[in-house]
Design a protein with these regions (language model features):
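Zn-dependent metallopeptidase/amidohydrolase metal-coordination segment
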Residues: 109-142
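Glycine-rich beta-alpha junction loops
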Residues: 14, 76-82, 110, 129-131
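A C-terminal functional module that forms or caps the active site or interfaces directly
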Residues: 88-121
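Metabolite-binding pocket within alpha/beta catalytic cores that recognizes anionic/polar moieties
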Residues: 1-58
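Generic non-transmembrane alpha-helical segments
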Residues: 58-66, 114, 153-161
Length: 161
């Protein structure tokens, strides 16, 4: 539609790993969902999608060049903010244990799935803005002004593609 072949999504996420701190950058390896996006779109029972490994390699190399720290891992793609979930611990207990989910966001699964269907490439960088384990969050103002490392990494990586 827009003749785009590669997308690096940037956004915010909640931390599901006690080792993550506010404003840490996550490079998403796989996005897991309990939702039915793939089935509704394409009648496929699919709940995990991987990002494009070649884009991730460029991002990793760029992070090293720029001395930007990141954590690579798997995320949960939710249909609602976990802040509003009745029992977030019950939600976390449902995750496949072998996935080692480290964060939660709301778009990566669909992005990766659409990229697969269309023969495109997609990756995702996230900044941690709240922590389930540490009961911390950054302010709305900080969400607008403090995500510079992630944004710089995405832009410089795009130049290096």
């Amino acid at each position: 539609f827009y003749n785009v072949d590669t997308i690096i999504r940037i956004g915010s996420c909640g931390a599901y790993n006690e080792d993550l701190s506010l404003l840490d950058t996550i490079l998403v390896d796989n996005a897991y969902t309990e939702g039915n996006y793939a089935y509704e779109l394409n009648e496929e029972d699919c709940h995990i999608m991987n990002s494009s490994s070649d884009i991730n390699k460029v991002i990793e190399d760029t992070a090293k060049e720029l001395n930007i720290a990141y954590v690579k891992g798997n995320t949960l793609c939710t249909d609602c903010f976990d802040y509003y979930v009745k029992d977030v611990n019950s939600l976390i207990a449902r995750f496949p244990k072998d996935l080692n989910i480290i964060g939660a966001e709301m778009e990566a699964f669909a992005l990766f799935y659409n990229a697969k269907l269309l023969g495109k490439k997609a990756s995702c960088l996230l900044s941690v803005v709240d922590s389930h384990y540490k009961h911390q969050e950054i302010s709305a103002d900080e969400r607008q002004t403090s995500l510079n490392s992630m944004i710089k990494l995405a832009l410089e990586s795009a130049v290096n593609l």
